[in-house]
């Protein structure tokens, strides 16, 4: 089954559950108190931290038993960096939380609301005026990319960059890729 945002999706039976990057989440918990959020936004940010803690496939594995008794395992890998495009501070922070919990570095443009907090997020957040040149493989588009920007991404040399529509929030499971080992 595909890992997408659908109400019917059921998590696979895991022999080893996903493990969030707790160090990154602790740093983000500290940052929540510095961000200019009102009480309702702080509650939403805290909920995003809790959600990221349990909804990750980082270091998760499931065992698939073959018909002749062989042991096959299925695990997932994530990219090193994902570009978060657009959104307000709360939306961008929620996407950062999902990515950081999965051990993924977030790349933003200098005009992103998160960019001014890059000193507090060293190693978790990278600011780059040309994110497509920062070794990204995915774009979490909180706001739709302009057609010019899409043309620019399509016309560049190298691997394709996958655009993840994230207007309703980033679904971290879309970022992971299956790896099967026998």
Give, region by region, the residue ranges found by the protein language model.
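C-terminal segments
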Residues: 1-85, 89-91, 98-182
